[in-house]
């Protein structure tokens, strides 16, 4: 398989852009080189490496990396509450908070919004996933949930992936009002969730560390909200109160250092995904989306 640049659609303009990727050379080695694949399975996917790097990025000296990272990744710091010099470590910077009003949230009760900043793929029917990325192995909801009954509940449902790159805002939020459950944690590995990694094996989502909660809603049914760990993600922190009422746009939690993914799973016939996102997904290209931005409607 050839190594390709990661391209995506800038939704506001329709322009095709190339993503700036941190550690692109390493990703190429790990997922496209036979020796790299050996290293990936022997070391890189393991918890100890992500834990070690997470601790390293929490040390005071790590803050020296912030300025160059911001410049290289062209991050607009005017959107955030604190300036570069205020962060105690790179990790402190990594889960930085937005200023109030930095993201426009669509509060129309009939629409659902993105839980995070990132690149989105959406499958109106979960069965469509196998057509796009999986080769030689099948993605199953039973493995993903690690629960046969829940897999049955969401059979033929809708599957939405929001991939967060390292340069993105790394807090995630509720996509609609509802009642949120406690967190269920599923142990797993720490593979990268970059587009390069997913193209080689979509089942990474069934193998990585992940946790989920069920958001019970009035108009969109019971939404399974997954937060997925990845290479170098030191942890997933949930900041919400379990078994409570939540509002669209309220913070749910954040990822520590690394890139990672939020996945929403809907029951069958509960949501209609926006046409542009479906078309881009069918063309195997992600769409840029921001927290609070609409990606679908209630199915009437």
Curated annotation (Swiss-Prot):
Coiled coil: none annotated. Its main location: membrane. Its cofactor is pyruvate. Its EC number is 4.1.1.65. Is synthesized initially as an inactive proenzyme. Formation of the active enzyme involves a self-maturation process in which the active site pyruvoyl group is generated from an internal serine residue via an autocatalytic post-translational modification. Two non-identical subunits are generated from the proenzyme in this reaction, and the pyruvate is formed at the N-terminus of the alpha chain, which is derived from the carboxyl end of the proenzyme. The keyword Lyase applies. Pathway: Phospholipid metabolism; phosphatidylethanolamine biosynthesis; phosphatidylethanolamine from CDP-diacylglycerol: step 2/2. The modification Pyruvic acid (Ser) is found at residue 260. Keywords: Cell membrane, Decarboxylase, Lipid biosynthesis, Lipid metabolism, Lyase, Membrane, Phospholipid biosynthesis, Phospholipid metabolism, Pyruvate, Zymogen. GO terms for cellular component: plasma membrane. Pfam families: PS_Dcarbxylase. GO terms for biological process: phosphatidylethanolamine biosynthetic process. The record marks 259-260 as: Cleavage (non-hydrolytic). Transmembrane segments: none annotated. The keyword Transferase does not apply. Binds 1 pyruvoyl group covalently per subunit. It is found in: Cell membrane. InterPro entries: PS_Dcarbxylase, PSD-B, PSD_type2_pro. It comes from the Bacteria. One of its GO terms (molecular function) is phosphatidylserine decarboxylase activity. NCBIfam families: PRK00723.1, PS_decarb. Catalyzes the formation of phosphatidylethanolamine (PtdEtn) from phosphatidylserine (PtdSer). Belongs to the phosphatidylserine decarboxylase family. PSD-B subfamily. Prokaryotic type II sub-subfamily. Heterodimer of a large membrane-associated beta subunit and a small pyruvoyl-containing alpha subunit. This is Phosphatidylserine decarboxylase proenzyme. It comes from Fusobacterium nucleatum subsp. nucleatum (strain ATCC 25586 / DSM 15643 / BCRC 10681 / CIP 101130 / JCM 8532 / KCTC 2640 / LMG 13131 / VPI 4355).
């Amino acid at each position: 398989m050839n190594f390709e640049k990661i391209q995506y659609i800038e939704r506001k303009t329709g322009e095709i852009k190339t993503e700036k990727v941190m550690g692109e050379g390493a990703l190429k080695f790990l997922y496209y080189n036979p020796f790299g694949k050996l290293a990936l399975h022997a070391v890189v996917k393991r918890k100890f490496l992500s834990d070690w790097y997470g601790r390293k990025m929490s040390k005071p000296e790590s803050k020296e990396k912030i300025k160059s990272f911001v410049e290289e990744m062209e991050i607009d710091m005017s959107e955030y509450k604190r300036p570069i010099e205020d962060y105690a470590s790179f990790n402190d910077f990594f889960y930085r908070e937005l200023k109030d009003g930095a993201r426009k949230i669509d509060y129309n009760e009939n629409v659902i919004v993105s839980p995070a900043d990132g690149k989105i793929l959406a499958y109106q029917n979960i069965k469509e996933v196998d057509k796009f990325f999986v080769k030689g192995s099948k993605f199953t909801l039973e493995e993903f949930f690690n629960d046969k009954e829940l897999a049955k509940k969401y059979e033929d449902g809708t599957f939405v992936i929001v991939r967060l790159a390292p340069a993105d805002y790394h807090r995630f939020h509720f996509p609609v009002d509802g009642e949120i459950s406690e967190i269920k944690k599923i142990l797993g590995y720490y593979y990268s969730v970059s587009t390069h990694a997913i193209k080689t094996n979509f089942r990474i989502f069934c193998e990585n560390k992940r946790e989920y909660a069920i958001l019970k809603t009035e108009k969109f049914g019971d939404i399974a909200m997954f937060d997925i760990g990845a290479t170098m993600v030191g942890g997933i922190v949930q900041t919400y109160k379990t078994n409570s009422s939540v509002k669209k746009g309220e913070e749910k939690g954040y990822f520590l250092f690394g890139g990672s993914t939020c996945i929403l799973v809907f029951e069958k016939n509960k949501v209609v995904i926006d046409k542009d996102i479906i078309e881009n997904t069918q063309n195997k290209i992600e769409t840029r989306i921001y927290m609070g931005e609409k990606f679908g409607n209630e199915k009437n």
